[in-house]
């Protein structure tokens, strides 16, 4: 009843417009001008280079994180070299010491990187050429168009690693690199670089991540943290460019039993600025070992462990650029007299930045089945708009006519009922909600998807109120439970905003998941459960687990369509905003 009253109030406002054609840009619910306060808070690149090198042979080469390669242009050894080259060079641009940047060439041809690279050209930043990391580090080049394009001489030396015998040496070197302004070189290639004139500035071959923290904590920025597994090179460019600390949870790749840096993680999280983002991911460990700790300490996790070029992707993200806004659902199209069992399907894991940069659009989002079931998609609106604004605009432009969008999971991955419970929760939660509200209003996103460990807890309800208080344009919240997603059993909570409107907080009723649970299962199983509970009129939210596969290799929107096709004429699929 409260929801209907809210719509009646909205329609009263529409009617007051009179004979003038109604446009949503005139709606008091939509702000066309949003203050900058709180809008831009993630590390990004603010200085525009004049040119850039494309560094080849890294992305997405299968051997890029192997420690067993002998070729100097293969393996983790080469990967870390190239990441450090890019990070140090891009940092030099930021400091005004260079006009040439480094872009890690995507040999996979992903649309997101193509568009972002084209955006550099559109800004007048032109590719100087394609070279491998060895050439960029060691060759001499003449200036071009008055721009010094040679990288050799820009670095003070090298940091030595032994990634095969000491996995943590690569993590330590990722920090030492920005401290010593030195590229990362492994013992495998030491002789080659010394012949090219490089001198060792720091020996990380026997160092641990704990050693790096003790030695370098005072030389690292508190604005963010990178968590990545040993034996990986991803995100090092970003960490080096922004002077960040890099931490691995497992001391050996994918093996929690070989030792962990849990106490170090907790210490570093306490040291960070409040609400500072934590980038990356860890492998071979349950999320309650690291995401839960990140959340409790008052930081959002940014899943982006298999994405690249974050410095140049984020270039000038805070500057005004043409925005592609979402399709806004017109509530006047609703027949309020219709009696149906309404079902809305939405896709999980929309907080995942790397997924947005890879096959999300082609395999999950821009597909005909999404239109068929009026699918709702969660996007990392607040974070992607800062980290990769070109790809964000691309995704907004690909939105299907009958599909709706929502912010997923509130500016990073965290649990709203545990967020910052170890450190000044009320203040930090309000800051997170305010930042999120500014972003959602700017991009005209009206729905919010969030996650809680216990969706019915008092702490979760406290968070619902904070989000509603921060955003007077919020139309509704959808909340998942960490496990199971449908732990809220479809219960709806009502939260009153500052304007006096009651905003629905809807818990997930069922989820399509390739495992058996009372409220989780195959499309056929969930359809049968919905039919068993059919009434004259009802509303159910069904979350589609992004990584589940069902009979006939159905997944995502095709799995939702399969479920919808097994419902009868008592049901109707609608998008979440509808």
What are these regions (language model features)?
Residues 260, 387, 431-432, 457-460:
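Short, glycine/acidic-rich beta->alpha junctions
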Residues 286-289, 385-386, 551-555:
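Short, charged/polar "capping" segments at the starts of alpha-helices
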Residues 1-4:
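Positively charged n-region of N-terminal signal peptides that target proteins for export
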Residues 263-280, 343, 348-372, 382, ...:
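Catalytic grooves of carbohydrate-active enzymes
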Residues 378-445:
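Substrate-binding cleft of extracellular glycoside hydrolase catalytic domains
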Residues 20-319:
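Preference for solvent-exposed, low-hydrophobicity sequence contexts
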Residues 7-17:
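Hydrophobic h-region of N-terminal signal peptides that target proteins for export
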Residues 310-396:
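Active-site beta->alpha N-cap acidic-glycine motif
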